[in-house]
A protein has these predicted regions:
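Long, low-complexity, polar/charged, intrinsically disordered or flexibly structured peripheral segments
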Residues: 150-209
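Short, solvent-exposed beta-strand/turn "edge" segments of beta-rich domains on protein surfaces
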Residues: 77-82, 100-102, 209
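Early extracytoplasmic/domain-onset interaction patches
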Residues: 69-74
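Short amphipathic, basic-aromatic surface patches that mediate peripheral association
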Residues: 93-100, 226-227
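Short, well-ordered beta-strand segments enriched in hydrophobic/aromatic residues
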Residues: 84-91, 214-220
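Exposed beta-sheet edge/beta-hairpin loop segments within beta-rich domains
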Residues: 205-212, 229-234
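Acidic/polar low-complexity flexible segments
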Residues: 21-47, 103-176, 225-287
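Bacterial N-terminal signal peptides
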Residues: 5-16
Length: 287
């Protein structure tokens, strides 16, 4: 009888320990209310006043082509001013990869959001048939094109004397009203294999590569006229997922570093005081 009681107590203790050891969900991103407009520059020192949250990334192992994961950590900061919302992503990468060729790939980053405010969370793996997601993807080559930069010389450094274009794109960039390719593409997705680019994008992006680290800002109006869009309401919580591609490591398409759970993003109410950061941008972990 004593043996049975002892076994029962042991099982109860093991169950209790297992319940207590159940991993908690990811920490939330606080979307801080700012009064004077969101920060559009990735290197604006004002970002240092915004709390950061670091997220571990893992290789995509759900569907072919599996792989990636060379970037192990990304830092997220976010703000809104009642009119626009902005997210800044930072991660370490030993090289800035802006070229695309047969055997070269670009660096890129993406944030995914549920469409609308669903009662049931979509699959964190690019959504599902009943619950689509919208994905904002920034790519290093798009950003270079938008700025009118020439990537020909980067890829063929010894061929600058044989210029095949009528004029340098950097000159065209100075023309009033010039705008090249958007640095951000919006997609709609209902699961793996359904990724579809949208005809128009309402998201703007900017990037900076310095000291082995990418800093990327993605921003959008809080309200849009598109019903198939993420919804951001001050004082409420949305959610997001993250992905990073390292071109140097041949990461493209499904080969990427990702978060495997939805991350809560809590928007401050309008008029909330701006928080002081507990840690600065320099504390992004180098792994």
């Amino acid at each position: 009888m004593l043996r049975i009681c002892s076994l029962a107590i042991t099982m109860l203790l093991l169950f209790a320990h297992g319940a207590a050891a159940e991993p908690a969900g990811p920490a939330e991103v606080r979307v801080v209310f700012v009064r004077d407009g969101v920060f559009t520059s990735p290197t604006d020192s004002a970002w240092d006043e915004i709390p950061e949250t670091n997220y571990a990334l893992l290789a995509q192992q759900i569907t072919p082509p599996i792989g990636g994961g060379s970037v192990s950590n990304v830092c997220v900061r976010a703000t809104h001013d009642g009119d626009e919302i902005a997210f800044r992503l930072q991660w370490f990468d030993p090289s800035a990869d802006r070229g695309v060729g047969v055997d070269t790939f670009r660096d890129a980053a993406a944030i995914g959001f549920p469409v609308g405010r669903p009662n049931v969370a979509p699959s964190p793996f690019m959504g599902d048939e009943a619950h689509p997601v919208v994905i904002w993807q920034w790519a290093a080559d798009f950003d270079a094109d938008a700025e009118g930069k020439s990537r020909f010389g980067e890829r063929y450094p010894h061929a600058e004397g044989v210029w095949i274009f009528p004029q340098d794109l950097s000159v065209r960039r100075k023309v009033r009203g010039w705008r090249g390719a958007d640095p951000v593409i919006e997609y709609i997705s209902k699961g793996f294999g359904t990724l579809t680019p949208r005809m128009e994008t309402t998201v703007e992006g900017a990037s900076e590569y310095e000291d082995g680290r990418w800093s990327v800002v993605l921003r959008r109006k809080l309200e849009t006229s598109n019903e198939v869009d993420p919804v951001f309401i001050p004082g409420t919580t949305s959610s997001l997922i993250l992905a990073i591609w390292n071109g140097e490591e041949k990461e493209v398409n499904g080969r990427k570093a990702v978060t495997y759970q939805w991350i809560p993003a809590k928007l401050d109410g309008i008029g909330s005081p701006t928080a002081k950061a507990d840690v600065g941008a320099s504390n992004v972990r180098r792994e």
